């Protein structure tokens, strides 16, 4: 047990150093150049202890950090510090003869009660300032990142997706990509309309959406004739266009008779159908599905969609369309949100979130720039944290930061467990009550102040008041912009 405990301590100490505005950075000496990191889960994942028992202890904290990171994407340091305290106090009690199962039950009951309390106390995010505050705190008090994330969310809305990429310059910028991007480019480079940029651009194009292969030109001749009469370009999205059909399209395109381009359907298997359906709804097309017996040769112009602007490069296609029916689009987004709520797989939930964003018309790309590779890594991690924290806050509201929410929750513990008769369960509740003040105490210690004094002072104040380590004052943290997403605090507790 001692070895387990010492492993837990070693890891939690390294992670705990980064907590709070005055937290230090940790330098990880991995292969290649050392990395400077200020982010719990990365540190936890990087540390392996030589002693197998100690490493088993460290693995417990690593697990806690990873779980919190998966569910809330931030708050990993807080969760690790909590876990360490609970384990430390728990081992003490068990050593002195308490029943570990009852203690665990006591802790679980209390956590349940505290989470209900947290939900009551959390207040929804109001406007841009809150978003900026949450993002800044999470990125390690970086106002710049806070402003950026607030900008990005202004542009794409709460359903949008923020993706984070490395930029080749020193600047960090936010770009908003309108419309829906498909990761498939033109089937043949002959379709290019702008030879300088090697892209194909259409305006007000008709769109054919199908999951069939098009090989015979006679299947699409009626459509080609109609769209040529309408003087509208035609974009074909099909499983593949090959053989005679492709050859004919290319020849006629080069002679300037037809204005047409073809791309392969994105995704594969079940996901391909779903994505094609999304495109169809966005452009107002009828999805010509082979399993419904809708053949391409019978397609009429009315069944084609319309895209206001189409840009096709060699490996991606962007469609900007004004959805024909807003209701259908909203219904589709709602359906995807339900699926997102029900799925367990991380891969699926990422893909679903991406589809929701593409349909609701917003993908903001934050291009992260920095002077060195090391700085870039650190900045990307911080922005990633800030992004996750912001979406968590939009989802479940905010609570005062700086560990204050947990300190205030610790004062509610006796009320939750008033009627518990079992001594060991009560012990569990006490352990949790003592552990809850650890994050606030550590934030103060990292700022060079006596932790216990801070905790006692915070306990005596109202819910929103806490210790601000940046200004070294006790103040209303919500007004001072020191706020955490309730979801992050909740996940830290649960794990």
From Swiss-Prot:
Q: Which InterPro entries match?
A: Chaperonin_Cpn60_CS, Cpn60/GroEL, Cpn60/GroEL/TCP-1, GroEL-like_apical_dom_sf, GROEL-like_equatorial_sf, TCP-1-like_intermed_sf
An annotated Gene Ontology molecular function? ATP binding
Listed under GO biological process in this entry are:
protein refolding
Listed GO CC annotations: chloroplast
Q: Where in the cell is it found?
A: Plastid, Chloroplast
One Pfam family in the UniProt entry:
Cpn60_TCP1
Where are the disulfide bridges?
none
Question: Which PROSITE patterns does this UniProt record tie to the protein?
Answer: CHAPERONINS_CPN60
User: Which keywords accompany this UniProt record?
Assistant: ATP-binding, Chaperone, Chloroplast, Nucleotide-binding, Plastid
Q: Which residues form the signal peptide?
A: none
Superkingdom of the organism of origin: Eukaryota
**Similarity-based family:** Belongs to the chaperonin (HSP60) family.
Q: How does it assemble?
A: Oligomer of probably six alpha and six beta subunits.
What else the UniProt entry mentions is: This protein shows ATPase activity.
Q: What does this gene product do? A: This protein binds RuBisCO small and large subunits and is implicated in the assembly of the enzyme oligomer.
PANTHER family for the chain: 60 KDA HEAT SHOCK PROTEIN, MITOCHONDRIAL
Q: What's the name of the protein?
A: RuBisCO large subunit-binding protein subunit alpha
- Give the species this sequence originates from: Ricinus communis
């Amino acid at each position: 047990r001692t070895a387990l405990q010492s492993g837990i301590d070693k890891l939690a100490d390294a992670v705990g150093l980064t907590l709070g505005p005055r937290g230090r950075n940790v330098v990880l000496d991995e292969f290649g150049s050392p990395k400077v990191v200020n982010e719990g889960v990365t540190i936890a994942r990087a540390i392996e202890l030589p002693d197998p028992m100690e490493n088993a202890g460290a693995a417990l904290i690593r697990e806690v950090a990873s779980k919190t990171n998966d569910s809330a994407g931030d708050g990993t340091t807080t969760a690790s510090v909590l876990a360490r305290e609970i384990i430390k106090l728990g081992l003490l009690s068990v050593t002195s003869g308490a029943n570990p199962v009852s203690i665990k039950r006591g802790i679980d009951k209390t956590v349940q009660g505290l989470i209900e309390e947290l939900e009551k106390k959390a207040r929804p995010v109001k406007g841009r300032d809150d978003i900026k505050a949450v993002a800044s705190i999470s990125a390690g008090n970086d106002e710049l990142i806070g402003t950026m994330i607030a900008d990005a969310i202004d542009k794409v809305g709460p359903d949008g997706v923020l993706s984070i990429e490395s930029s080749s310059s020193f600047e960090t910028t936010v770009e908003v990509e309108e419309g829906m991007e498909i990761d498939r480019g033109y089937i043949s480079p002959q379709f290019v309309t702008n030879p300088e940029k090697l892209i194909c651009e259409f305006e007000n194009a008709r769109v054919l959406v199908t999951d069939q292969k098009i090989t015979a030109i006679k299947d699409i001749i009626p459509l080609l004739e109609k769209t040529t009469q309408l003087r509208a370009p035609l974009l074909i999205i099909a499983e593949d266009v090959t053989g005679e059909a492709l050859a004919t399209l290319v020849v006629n395109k080069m002679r300037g008779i037809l204005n047409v381009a073809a791309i392969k359907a994105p995704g594969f298997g079940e996901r391909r159908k779903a994505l094609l359906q999304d495109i169809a709804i966005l452009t107002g097309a009828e999805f010509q599905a082979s399993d419904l017996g809708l053949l391409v040769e019978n397609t009429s112009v009315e069944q084609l969609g319309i895209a206001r602007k189409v840009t096709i490069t060699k490996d991606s296609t962007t469609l900007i369309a004004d959805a024909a029916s807003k209701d259908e689009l909203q219904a589709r987004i709602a359906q995807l949100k339900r699926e997102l709520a029900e799925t367990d797989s991380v891969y699926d939930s990422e893909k679903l979130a991406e589809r929701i964003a593409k349909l609701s018309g917003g993908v903001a790309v934050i291009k992260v720039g920095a002077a060195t590779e090391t700085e870039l890594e650190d900045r990307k991690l911080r922005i990633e944290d800030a992004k996750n924290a912001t979406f968590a806050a939009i989802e479940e509201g905010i609570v005062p930061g700086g560990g204050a929410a947990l300190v205030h929750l610790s004062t509610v513990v006796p009320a939750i467990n008033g009627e518990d008769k079992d001594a060991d369960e009560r012990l569990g509740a006490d352990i949790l009550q003592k552990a809850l003040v650890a994050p606030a105490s550590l934030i103060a210690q990292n700022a060079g102040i006596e932790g216990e004094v801070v905790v006692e002072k915070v306990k005596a104040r109202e819910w929103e008041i806490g210790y601000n380590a940046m200004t070294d004052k006790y103040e209303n943290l919500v007004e001072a912009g020191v706020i955490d997403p309730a979801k992050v605090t909740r996940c830290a507790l649960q794990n």
